Amino acid sequence: MKKIIAACLITIAFSCENKAQTPKAQEAIINAKPVEVPIKNGKAKAYFASGCFWCVEAIYESVKGVDEVISGYSGGHTQNPTYKASNTGKTGHAEAVEVIYDPNIVSFETLVEVYFGSQNPTQVNGQGNDRGSQYRSIIFYQNDEQKQIILKKKDALAKKLNASIAAEVYPFQKFWRAEDYHQNYERLHPNNSYIQNVSIPRLNRFKAKFPDLLKENK
């Protein structure tokens, strides 16, 4: 019996230790020095998490000056996250997008405006019925200039709405591309029920709000 009790105590202690490590690992991500992605062939990259990446990908794809948007994961403390793993809420990662854009056409500041203007900025840990830490709102900065832009926009919105803004502000570390079947999901699956009932309506609300930012025929 003593051996059984001892074994149980060891198991509990090990479990508690693992649970204690997760917040510390996540804290290290939040307090890390940002990684700056260099401009390549005149194109810059920005990173955002705002609920389901299918929705966010389609929104940024419609913006003038944006060349490509890739769905993936970022903001967590584990390596090589997958859709299944991120959905457990234990990786720290959120569904995110990589926005590849021409800074001569659209600025990082405008991309942040698109971000706040295309979501429910006060909803914590999700957008709509997509709920959980994997759907939380995060804006990633690569340098202090970007950080100040984000904080200024966030503060102004909080004052305008007289409410707390849910978006977390993280130093960018790494973006992990999602599985191929997630890429261009809205465009490739227009008849999917989620796309019809959630993604397209969200995109249309954004379009009505920011008509001057849209590409032609979008």
Indicate where each model-derived feature is located.
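Bacterial Sec-dependent N-terminal signal peptides
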Residues: 1-25
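Flexible coil/turn and secondary-structure edge motifs
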Residues: 16-218
